[in-house]
Amino acid sequence: TAGFFRAAYRSGALKDTIILSETCEFYGKSGHLDTSMADALLSGGAACVVGYVNNVYTVYSRSMLWATVNRLLAGDTVREAVDFGLNLYGADDIIWYNNQGGRRPHAVASFPVLSGNQDARLRAVQAAADSTQQAA
């Protein structure tokens, strides 16, 4: 629950982290956006939180996660990395499901939601890029 995260990560314990959740209903359900979980993590110091509203197909969320992580490792911002995945797999999981030949999608589409600093980058990747630029 949001209360758990708020209590567990007080005083900036998550300083500058990027949190990617591939769980169902992280940002709410039945099409109703609920940012309480993300807000709790951001109040604990997270730079950016990405998750899904509604129930999400596992393969879609896992594929989006891998695409996002790989782009973050390549130096993209969180927004750029998620956009890369969206371009690859579709704006929501029902688009992805139908493109896979699915015939009976679930009732409400799931899509990624971002909160916090969408321009955040992985610190180690950013530090390496900065040192490369300084050397040049």
Describe these PLM feature segments.
Residues 131-135:
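Long, soluble alpha-helical segments
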Residues 18-130:
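Active-site-proximal C-terminal subdomain of hydrolase catalytic domains
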Residues 1-28:
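Mobile, glycine- and charge-enriched loop segments
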